[in-house]
């Protein structure tokens, strides 16, 4: 875990691939507990430390996660995420080059909870939810392409599912059609940047994640 930004009300950390944001049935220690311990030790706080989980990243994804350190910040950030006032930018290394260097993708996504997987359709189907994202090619090597992705909606596995539907699965993402896994079990999707108005001070906050420690990321990033 790396702290990217911190003040009295919020803390933004860079999550490593493989970490879970919040506790689940695996029993593995979540990032939220690691951050609580960091706050407890840094500020010598006795007893329980307040930390609000505002959003999540899939376990194999790396990058920025925003937490609230006060109940006031938690309430306001929850509303801001719900209302699309937190602008998140993702970087994805994908197989193949998209047909268009820049485009908006619109699909209808159906989530299969038993498989923990989503399926994208070009038209509305039963139990589907509309999913929209924008992408832009910002780098490439001989075999891979780096896309900058902005979500217009927030669906289950949306980026992974929609890019795979386009014929450009994320490197290492076996679930969505990548031919091989990454050696460390990650998928090459990074929550790269967040920008929002601070819920208390009203200042504009911009944070960027460090690149994963990987030769391909270093070679392909602009």
Which positions does each model-derived feature cover?
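RNA pseudouridine synthases
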Residues: 1-222
């Amino acid at each position: 875990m790396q702290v990217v930004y911190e003040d009295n009300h919020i803390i933004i950390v860079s999550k490593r691939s493989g970490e879970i944001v919040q506790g689940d049935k695996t029993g593995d220690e979540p990032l939220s507990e690691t951050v609580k311990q960091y706050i407890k030790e840094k500020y010598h706080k006795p007893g329980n430390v307040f930390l609000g989980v505002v959003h999540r990243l899939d376990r194999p994804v790396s990058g920025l996660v925003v937490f609230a350190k006060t109940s006031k910040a938690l309430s306001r950030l929850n509303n801001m995420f719900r209302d699309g006032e937190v602008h998140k930018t993702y970087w994805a290394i994908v197989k193949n080059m998209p047909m268009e260097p820049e485009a908006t993708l619109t699909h209808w996504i159906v989530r299969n909870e038993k498989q923990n997987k989503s399926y994208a359709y070009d038209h509305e189907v039963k139990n589907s939810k509309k999913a929209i994202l924008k992408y832009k090619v910002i780098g490439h090597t001989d075999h891979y392409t780096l896309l900058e992705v902005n979500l217009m909606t927030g669906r289950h596995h949306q980026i992974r599912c929609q890019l795979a539907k386009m014929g450009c699965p994320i490197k290492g993402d076996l679930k969505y059609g990548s031919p091989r896994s990454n050696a460390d079990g990650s998928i090459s999707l990074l929550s790269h940047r967040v920008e929002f108005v601070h819920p208390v001070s009203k200042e504009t906050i911009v944070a960027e994640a460090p690149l994963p420690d990987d030769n391909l990321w270093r070679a392909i990033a602009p």
